[in-house]
Amino acid sequence: MVDHARARKMADRIKEIVARKLDRGIKDPRLGFVTVTDVRVTGDLQHASIFYTVYGTDEERADTAAALKSATGMLRSEVGKNITARLTPSLEFILDGVPENAAAIDALLEEARRRDADVQAQAKSGVYAGDEDPYVKPRVIGEDEDEDDEDGDDIDRSAPGYEPAH
């Protein structure tokens, strides 16, 4: 049976332990500016996926990935010392795609703003296809129209072939 609350608590604890150790405990020069963004632990608490971002170039990201791979054993033993679980979960470091996704979303939003500005410019210089006011107005009865019919149905009863309904 999976206890999601326990897995979430363990993930939060692992995130804190690993982030602290990366900040203060690892002296590898290949390790760049790393931010632990998320940790996900499986339901059986046997495996932890640690998502991280690196500020820098692609080369610095590759160097940081190599440094994390070499430090995985030390980080796992540190996690094992600081959590209260029977078994220490295995650790896997995954480069998080958040910065790339954020840049792609920013580019899409900028494209949408540009297109909105183009549409607004076209709307200002455009002309209406019909009347300026497309809504139907109530009919105003003029003096030249037949107003003298008492029953108001505007039927010419003197026309040839007219027969009243029975």
Swiss-Prot record:
| Matching InterPro entries | KH_dom-like_a/b (IPR015946), RbfA (IPR000238), RbfA_dom_sf (IPR023799)
Gene Ontology CC entries for this record: cytosol
Bias (Acidic residues) ranges:
143-154
Citing just one GO molecular function, the answer is:
ribosomal small subunit binding
- Cytoplasm as a keyword of this entry, yes or no, is yes
Protein's GO biological process: maturation of SSU-rRNA
Cellular location of this protein? Cytoplasm
Q: Which UniProt keywords apply?
A: Cytoplasm, Ribosome biogenesis
Give the source's domain of life in one word. Bacteria
Region of interest: Disordered = 119-166
Function (record text): One of several proteins that assist in the late maturation steps of the functional core of the 30S ribosomal subunit. Associates with free 30S ribosomal subunits (but not with 30S subunits that are part of 70S ribosomes or polysomes). Required for efficient processing of 16S rRNA. May interact with the 5'-terminal helix region of 16S rRNA.
What protein family is recorded? Belongs to the RbfA family.
How the protein assembles, per its UniProt entry? Answer: Monomer. Binds 30S ribosomal subunits, but not 50S ribosomal subunits or 70S ribosomes.
NCBIfam families found in the cross-reference section: rbfA (TIGR00082)
Q: Supply the name of the protein.
A: Ribosome-binding factor A
* Organism encoding this protein: Clavibacter michiganensis subsp. michiganensis (strain NCPPB 382)
